[in-house]
């Protein structure tokens, strides 16, 4: 009687289970912990049109994330989007008023970021985890130092969508977060209304 086939089948099943456990562990290890639970930003203390001049500062990247080349590359790309999306808005506002007066500083800062580059997406796929970025933007009265608003913004690219689009969704995330900032800025020019953050009420659903 041949007992070899059943034993081989048992080993195969055990190997499959171990492989599944290993994959789940790898996915858990790559889970992105960057999240934002708030869905809406409060209105600024005054509408932005109360100022005569506007200055858009360069993006600051939190020091904890400066060491990673992929994060630095993503920061440069976000900066490019600020130049093409936000800078024209600021320039247009500055042409409306020739009078000297108060100046509003716009200071974007990346608080947290995890960016999966195209190389990692090709070689590792969804096991690299999701991409995510969390930003704060300070709107400050240049003369008095008063903080007029400090909204937070969040975007992510899910691991599977990033992998199946070969990194397109990861890169599109960088464009989307600048779109959120631009929309908040323009919507609060004529009246202080606040705006969406891009976060989710149940941030636990964004762990991977």
Tell me the role of every PLM-derived stretch.
Residues 3-19:
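Bacterial N-terminal signal peptides that target proteins for export
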Residues 24-30:
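Hydrophobic h-region of N-terminal signal peptides that target proteins for export
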Residues 30-84, 116, 152, 183-208:
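A structural "domain/chain start" motif
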Residues 67-72, 146-191:
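Short secondary-structure boundary motifs at beta->alpha junctions and helix caps
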Residues 74-78, 125, 169:
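Alpha-helix N-cap and loop-to-helix initiation/capping positions
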Residues 79, 83, 87, 134, ...:
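Extracytoplasmic/secreted envelope proteins and their assembly/folding machinery
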């Amino acid at each position: 009687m041949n007992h070899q086939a059943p034993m081989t089948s048992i080993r195969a099943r055990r190997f499959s289970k171990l492989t599944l456990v290993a994959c789940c562990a790898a996915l858990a290890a790559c889970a992105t912990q960057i999240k934002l639970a708030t869905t809406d930003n409060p209105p600024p203390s005054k509408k932005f049109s109360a100022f005569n001049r506007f200055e858009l500062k360069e993006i600051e990247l939190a020091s904890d994330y400066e060491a990673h080349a992929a994060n630095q590359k993503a920061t440069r790309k976000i900066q490019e989007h600020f130049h093409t999306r936000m800078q024209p808005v600021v320039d247009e506002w500055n042409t409306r008023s020739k009078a000297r007066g108060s100046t509003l500083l716009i200071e974007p800062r990346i608080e947290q970021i995890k960016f999966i580059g195209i190389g990692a997406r090709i070689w590792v796929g969804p096991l690299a985890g999701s991409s995510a970025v969390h930003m704060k933007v300070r709107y400050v009265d240049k003369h008095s130092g008063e903080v007029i608003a400090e909204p937070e913004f969040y975007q992510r690219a899910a691991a599977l969508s990033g992998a199946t689009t070969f990194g397109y969704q990861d890169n599109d995330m960088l464009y989307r977060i600048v779109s959120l900032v631009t929309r908040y800025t323009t919507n609060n020019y004529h009246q202080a209304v606040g705006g969406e953050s891009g976060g989710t009420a149940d941030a636990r659903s964004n762990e991977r």
